[in-house]
UniProtKB/Swiss-Prot annotation:
UniProt-recorded name of the protein: Tetratricopeptide repeat protein 5
GO biological process, one term: DNA damage response
Subunit structure, as described in the record: Interacts with JMY and p300/EP300; the interaction occurs in the nucleus and augments the association between JMY and p300/EP300 in response to DNA damage. Interacts with PRMT5; the interaction is DNA damage-dependent and promotes PRMT5 interaction with p53/TP53 and subsequent methylation. Forms a complex with HSF1 and p300/EP300; these interactions augment chromatin-bound HSF1 and p300/EP300 histone acetyltransferase activity, resulting in enhanced heat-shock-responsive transcription.
Organism of derivation: Bos taurus
Record function comment: Cofactor involved in the regulation of various cellular mechanisms such as actin regulation, autophagy, chromatin regulation and DNA repair. In physiological conditions, interacts with cofactor JMY in the cytoplasm which prevents JMY's actin nucleation activity and ability to activate the Arp2/3 complex. Acts as a negative regulator of nutrient stress-induced autophagy by inhibiting JMY's interaction with MAP1LC3B, thereby preventing autophagosome formation. Involves in tubulin autoregulation by promoting its degradation in response to excess soluble tubulin.
Presence of the UniProt keyword Nucleotidyltransferase in the record: no
One GO location term (cellular component): cytoplasmic vesicle
Entry comment on modification after translation: Phosphorylation by ATM kinase induces nuclear accumulation while interfering with nuclear export, and phosphorylation by CHEK2 kinase enhances nuclear stability.
């Protein structure tokens, strides 16, 4: 008799598992059966599919009602939407009490707490699941949660970010063909990039992880968060064309999410205003501009003009003053430029602080300064010297708009000399990255 009952339970669980797998497949592969034009309907369609699945599950369950696996699968079905479900929390909490070693129930419960905004409880669930069994889902989720845990100090947050990268790498090692693991590793590297002074090697690792996610998992390309996060990195690296493309794609994939569209518009607005200011040299009148340029003095070079400049290699070097129009793309070692500020431009995101620099009758160059405190800035008429300037040439085309301009990237205001004076350490601050608190 027991054997027959066990067989029945097994059959019921198998059927329930199939129904839940189909529901999640519907969500993950939505854009394989729908066009991007249907993106606005996706959440509603998933919700309707969930209701349908729960109804079918109810018909199958029968007398197996209180079984831990049944509770887990029902909770998982309720957890398919991005919203917090109190019912899912209740069922999954019961499931882990009945069967504390049921790892999938712990993982699902952790996701429920995450959606509820209880990051500490989510962390406990994923860590607890790993004590029962090493599995990629707990590692993925732990990586995600570690970056959002509240901390009392910057050092503690840095440790969490490093740990987040470690957990994501472990998840990738467990299954190199899991796109979600690669995507979460990309996000961990993105946080590390902003947490450790924007090392270009780390941004490359983030971009490689995102590319790998798309390569191994066809559904990764329809993940709006992947496109937004990658675009954030591209924008910071001044790859504006790729950034606009990413924001635009994220907006198309999730029309109800305002951030990608806003970020695309903000960047377009910034580029439009910047190129207009560059063309008009900040609308400074010719006579005024000539007077400003006539006031440029070698003394304004400060430590960049007397052989005391310490290069990145740590050696003291004598810099050669060059006109802006003689700069080559990339870092111009051994050179220094000196010019007058003709405009400044801040964005809603405050980073970078952008200003226009002119040193002759030639064109105006944009200077983009990163990692500065919000109170730092330069004024129109200030003399600014930039040692070993890093020149970028921009050619951007997006939705019928064209932008072309030259810019100098400055990683910290500490590199600048303003009116002959080096900038103090109080002018520098670290950049941060914000992401929406939802399951990755």
């Amino acid at each position: 008799m027991m054997a027959v009952e066990e067989e029945e339970v097994k059959e019921v669980l198998q059927k329930l598992q199939e129904l839940v797998d189909q529901l999640y497949s519907f969500r993950e592969c939505y854009f394989e059966t729908h066009s991007v034009d249907d993106a606005g309907r996706k959440q509603q369609d998933v919700r309707e599919e969930m209701e349908k699945t729960l109804q079918q599950m109810e018909e199958v369950v029968g007398s197996v009602q209180g079984n831990a696996q049944v509770l887990m699968l029902t909770g998982k079905a309720l957890n398919v939407t991005p919203d917090y479900s109190p019912k899912a929390e209740e069922l999954l909490s019961k499931a882990v009490k009945l069967e504390p070693k049921l790892v999938e129930a712990w993982n699902q419960l952790g996701e429920v707490y995450w959606k509820k905004g209880d990051v500490a409880a989510a962390h406990t669930c994923f860590s607890g699941a790993l004590t029962h069994c090493k599995n990629k889902v707990s590692l993925q989720n732990l990586s995600m949660v570690l970056r959002q845990l509240r901390t009392d100090s910057g050092d503690e947050h840095s440790r969490h970010v490093m740990d987040s990268v470690r957990q994501a790498k472990l998840a990738v090692q467990m299954d190199i063909l899991d796109g979600r693991s690669w995507y979460i590793l990309g996000n961990a590297y993105l946080s590390l990039y902003f947490n450790t002074g924007q090392n270009p090697k780390i941004s490359q690792q983030a971009l490689s992880a995102y590319a790998q996610a798309e390569k191994v998992d066809r559904t990764a390309s329809s993940n709006p968060d992947l496109h937004l996060n990658r675009a954030t990195l591209h924008k910071y690296e001044e790859n504006y064309g790729e950034a606009l493309e990413g924001f635009s794609r994220a907006a198309a994939l999730d029309p109800a999410w305002p951030e990608p569209w806003q970020r695309e518009q903000q960047l377009l607005d910034f580029l439009t205003r910047l190129t207009s200011f560059l063309e008009s040299k900040g609308k400074v009148k010719t006579k005024k501009l000539q007077s400003m340029l006539g006031n440029l003095r070698p003394a304004h070079l400060g430590p960049c003009g007397d052989g005391r400049y310490q290069s990145a290699s740590g050696q003291k070097v004598t810099l050669e003053r060059k006109p802006l129009n003689a700069l080559q793309p990339g870092v111009n070692s051994g050179a220094v430029v000196l010019g007058k500020v003709v405009f400044s431009l801040t964005t809603e995101e405050k980073v970078p602080f952008t200003f226009g620099l002119v040193d002759s009758d030639g064109p105006c160059y944009a200077v983009m300064v990163y990692n500065m405190v919000q109170s730092w800035g330069v004024l129109i008429g200030d003399s600014v010297a930039i040692p070993e300037p890093n020149l970028r040439l921009h050619r951007i085309q997006h939705k019928g708009k064209d932008y072309s301009f030259s810019s100098v990237r400055v990683e910290t205001p500490l590199l600048l000399v303003v009116n002959g004076k080096p900038q103090g350490s109080s002018s520098q601050a670290a950049a941060t990255v914000a992401s929406r608190p939802q399951c990755e």
